[in-house]
Amino acid sequence: VEAADAIDRRRLAGMKIGTNAVRRAAYLRRLFPDAEVIHFRGAADTRLKKLDERIPQKLPDGGEAGSADALIMGASGLERIGRAERISRILSPDLMLPAVGQAIVAVECPASDWATRAALARID
């Protein structure tokens, strides 16, 4: 564990971390057992607004989870909507694996197409 990760863990103790992904929530509970992970729904801009304005998150059963102190969201989604400046830290795949198939590209070509196969071999 790097020193920076240990500092992050201490700072997150007792905080509420919001995420919309079940996979991320599971990783967060393992990484930061002293933090409370809450289901945080909505489009990316909506979630950022709820974070900034400390708006309590409504639960499907009608209750409230309170407001979040931090959010874990996909960096590519924030970049796509022009909000990359909101990213304070990128979590490495060593800490939190991306979703299965995320950033995966597959290419098919006929087995007999040697020129295409040679070109594809350079990027494999």
Predicted regions and their residues:
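Small-molecule-sensing regulatory modules
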Residues: 30, 34-124
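A conserved helix-loop-strand patch within extracytoplasmic ligand-binding domains
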Residues: 1-35
